[in-house]
Every structure is written in C-alpha cells, then in structure tokens.
Amino acid sequence: MSEEQPTFEENLATLETIVAQLEQGDIPLEQALTQFQKGVALSKELQTTLQDAEKTLTTMMNDSDQEVAFETPQGGTGDAD
C-alpha cells in the first residue's frame, strides 16, 4: 500500500509549526537542527510546487495553439524575480 503525499496546505502548516518551535528557542540543539533541516526541505518542496503552479497559470493556449504568457494586472508576466 503506497502512502499518500501530504498536500501543499499540510506541508505549509508543518513548516509554520517548525518555524514557531524554532522561534521559541526552547528545544534542544539537536532537535532544532533536525527541525531546521526538515523546514528547509519543506520550503524547497513548497517553492517547487508554487513554481509549477505559476508555470501552469502563466502559460495559456490561444486559438492557434501557441503559448501565451498570462499578463498580471500590473502588466508583468507574473515573474517575482
């Protein structure tokens, strides 16, 4: 039986919990390092998910099947960089 992957929202909630624990500063150093590493990994996974979602939203097909960049209200292409 395969285990289901956590949703984006579940991963975000886990990351927020880790950040709160680290901000409190009352956990042992070894546990803090482990939690930090887990947080970094979750952060990378969440960033990848957001980038994939952005690609999906920013690339649309027009009537002649050409990719068209989605325009944001500010006139950009949605790139945060």
From Swiss-Prot:
GO biological process: DNA catabolic process
Record key words, sorted: Cytoplasm, Exonuclease, Hydrolase, Nuclease
Gene Ontology molecular-function annotations: exodeoxyribonuclease VII activity
Top enzyme category: hydrolase
EC number: 3.1.11.6
Any one annotated GO CC term: exodeoxyribonuclease VII complex
Catalytic activity: Exonucleolytic cleavage in either 5'- to 3'- or 3'- to 5'-direction to yield nucleoside 5'-phosphates
Subcellular location: Cytoplasm
Highest taxon of source: Bacteria
Residue numbers spanned by region Disordered: 61-81
HAMAP family registered for this protein in UniProt: Exonuc_7_S
Similarity remark: Belongs to the XseB family.
PANTHER family in alphabetical order: EXODEOXYRIBONUCLEASE 7 SMALL SUBUNIT (PTHR34137:SF1)
Function comment: Bidirectionally degrades single-stranded DNA into large acid-insoluble oligonucleotides, which are then degraded further into small acid-soluble oligonucleotides.
Subunit structure: Heterooligomer composed of large and small subunits.
Protein name: Exodeoxyribonuclease 7 small subunit
Protein source organism: Levilactobacillus brevis (strain ATCC 367 / BCRC 12310 / CIP 105137 / JCM 1170 / LMG 11437 / NCIMB 947 / NCTC 947)
Gene: xseB
